[in-house]
Amino acid sequence: CCELPCHGCVPCCWP
């Protein structure tokens, strides 16, 4: 649900 370098459903990946 996100993209690199953040690859996982975590707050740092959320829009």
Curated annotation (Swiss-Prot):
Superkingdom per UniProt: Eukaryota
Subcellular location: Secreted
The entry's keywords: Disulfide bond, Neurotoxin, Secreted, Toxin
Residue ranges the record marks as coiled coil: none
Record flagged with keyword Endoplasmic reticulum: no
Covalent S-S links between cysteines: C1-C13, C2-C9, C6-C12
Annotated GO MF terms: toxin activity
Expression by tissue: Expressed by the venom duct.
Entry's family note: Belongs to the conotoxin M superfamily.
Domain notes: The cysteine framework is III (CC-C-C-CC).
Protein name: BtIIIB
